[in-house]
């Protein structure tokens, strides 16, 4: 059985979108997967502003890049690739799910 990061990694590798955003089918599939994932749903929505999926390392005091989903501040559409501001903190919440805080936002980040 595949876990959440395996599913997302597979989607990201097979995506036909460009550097700005995932293709619409991939973005829709990942959004539905995130919305139905037990671990993601176990985290209260007030803890984060959006969810980011990334295949790149996320490091303290650096910027991160990834595709954003379920942005509660309505800044980005699902599947849009973003580069965050500098990361202030990283907290592991669940297996492969982290809360990453920047100066302006808090994200749930799905990564290995």
UniProtKB/Swiss-Prot annotation:
Superkingdom per UniProt: Viruses
Protein name stated in the entry: Uncharacterized 12.8 kDa protein in cd-pseT intergenic region
Organism of provenance: Enterobacteria phage T4 (Bacteriophage T4)
Chain's gene name: y13D
């Amino acid at each position: 059985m595949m876990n959440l990061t395996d599913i997302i990694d597979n989607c990201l590798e097979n995506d036909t979108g460009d550097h700005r955003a995932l293709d619409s089918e991939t973005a829709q599939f990942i959004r539905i997967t995130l919305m139905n994932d037990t671990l993601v749903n176990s985290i209260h929505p007030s803890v984060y502003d959006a969810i980011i999926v990334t295949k790149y390392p996320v490091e303290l005091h650096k910027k991160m890049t990834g595709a954003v989903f379920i942005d509660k501040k309505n800044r980005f559409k699902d599947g849009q690739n973003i580069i965050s501001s500098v990361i202030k903190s990283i907290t592991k919440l669940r297996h492969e799910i982290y809360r990453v805080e920047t100066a302006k936002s808090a994200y749930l980040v799905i990564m290995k």
